[in-house]
Amino acid sequence: MKTIRGKVYVVRDDIDTDQIIPAQYLNLVPTIPEEYAKLGSYALCGLPDEYPAFVAQGQAKGLYPIIIAGRNFGCGSSREHAPIALGAAGVKAVIAESYARIFFRNAVATGELYPFETPNRLCDNLKTGDEVEIDISASNFKVIGTGAVYPLQELGAVAPVVEAGGIFAYARKSGIIG
Amino acid sequence: MGMTITEKILAKAAGKACLGPGDNVWVKVDILLTHDVCGPGTIGVFHREFGANARVWNPSGVVIIPDHYIFTADQKAHRNVDTLRSFVKQQGLPYFYDPGTRTYKGVCHVALPEEGHVRPGEVIFGTDSHTCTHGALGAFATGIGNTDAGFILGTGKLLIKVPKTLRFRIEGTIPEYLMAKDIILRIIGDIGFDGASYCAMEFTGEAIRRLSIEERMTICNMAIEAGGKNGIIEPDDKTFAYVQQRSRKPFEAIYGDGNSRVESERVYDAATLEPCVAEPHVPSNYATARSRREVKLDRAYIGSCTGGKLTDFLAAARILRGRKVTIPTFLVPATTEVAEGLIREEIHGKSLVQIFADAGCEDIAPPSCAACLGGPEDTYGRTRSNEAVISTTNRNFPGRMGSKQSRIYLASPLTVAASAVAGHIEDPRDYL
Ligand code: SF4
């Protein structure tokens, strides 16, 4: 049984890539290791000020391996910097009502995080700091405090790609490319 | 069952007689576009995965157009352009529009068709979400991330899912106060910010056929603002005239079948549409311009891939000629070709450059993305605090033009120009 457990960070609808990683940090190149780490330290710093900081000042990573979101998470630009910044900040999974197409694809292609979809509007039920446990094989997750279990849409063919670490790793593992 | 234009282009690129929405197919890529923000990462993925000595699949299929962070002192931005330069050299790539040289162009989505890299029926991927612009010339074009782009550099192929098609039929004639931006903002307002997620947005009808190629680009550019995978318009004589002036390469125009099946069809009459704005902080926040006259503005901005073309500046100049702006008005031509047009084109014997200067606009910036996406601290036109900006760009997300506190209203160049004169949101009808 593969699980992801930890504190959640809760955001609402239409979180765009400019909020996930503001444009002034796009001078950082994700394939350069120090700059990959730097991207993590800026993850979600473009959110409006009423949100608590996702990564504390001076820290490289956040405290939240799981993001709970509403509809259309990751809309906007095609910048792969977005899932990468989240991954570099320690995010392992996002649970959203829906995703923008390019963000979903980039999350899978890079293997940075699992983009789960859920039929429930969890951003109204959960608050930042709640602890949850995702059961990837059972496609559900449990809120530790209340014991409530919510379904996740099955990831299907996407799960092994993220697990392998992205499309290149997956394609090699399964013999699609040499 | 017939196929739509999107399905037929993908079928051809996949070597299949027929396919339909939801099918996953490997398509052959004609053009891969990248720029200074995503190019270095794409190159990083390419070398990491295919090796330090790997060669790109087809040097003339790769087009590199630096445009985002050009006129800045930021050292990493310069390093990134250097990374592109050495890759171009190493791979012998013929199409590179190098900043600081005569070949420099500016914003990639205006430069790509201008330089003849977009042809009807082709498959174009770009590491930028507004790659959907190029559907205006009857191509399939969409944005991807660095990893997918690195895969294309090595193989010339990509696995993609065939999108469903949403059809938008715009009929009638276009009133002189209405622009393509008003049409697309209305559509996005109607279907919502994620109303076209994973779908092709096909634009058709008499009013679309009446639009210039530049105006068609404005429409397809913003398909992504409804979550669309691609925007597309069937080619016609205007398309062929535009392409043949710029490209010698043969192409095969592709059209949808008469009996093609679409997911939904919406019909609009252009004559009933109104000048409008998208209010902060999503492009689907539609309001007519005249219903928002109480909104006071701090600055106006004309630029970007969707609103910095010559036709956009001509529209603004129609209003600004003989008038004065009352708020700082920033002008950024998308490309060097547009910048030359501002000097060359005249209205009643006055060049556009002169008209804007007489109206009291800020000095015109050199072509690039500039403050459309905020950019480094020293970027021209970047917002600093809680300014209210009216802009011809395509996104009004929090912080998009710099400061998180600023509020961005998206509008057509006519509406932006009228508002720059009024100092508040203004309907351009009274100014024409
Ligand atoms: S002008 Fe704006 S939207 Fe267009 S490519 Fe540049 S940053 Fe992106």
Predicted regions and their residues:
Chain A
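A generic structural signal for short, non-catalytic loop/turn and secondary-structure boundary residues
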Residues: 1-4, 36, 127, 145
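N-terminal, positively charged, Ser/Thr/Ala/Gly-biased leader segments
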Residues: 1-33, 169-178
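Short clusters of hydrophobic/aromatic residues that line enzyme substrate/ligand-binding pockets
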Residues: 20, 43, 152
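Acidic, glycine-rich flexible loop/linker segments
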Residues: 108-178
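Feature captures the catalytic cores and cofactor-binding loops of soluble hydro-lyases/lyases
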Residues: 10, 26-138
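Conserved phosphate/anionic-ligand binding catalytic regions in large, soluble enzymes, centered on
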Residues: 15-16, 74-81, 162-172
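Generic structural signal for alpha-helix starts
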Residues: 22, 100, 155-156
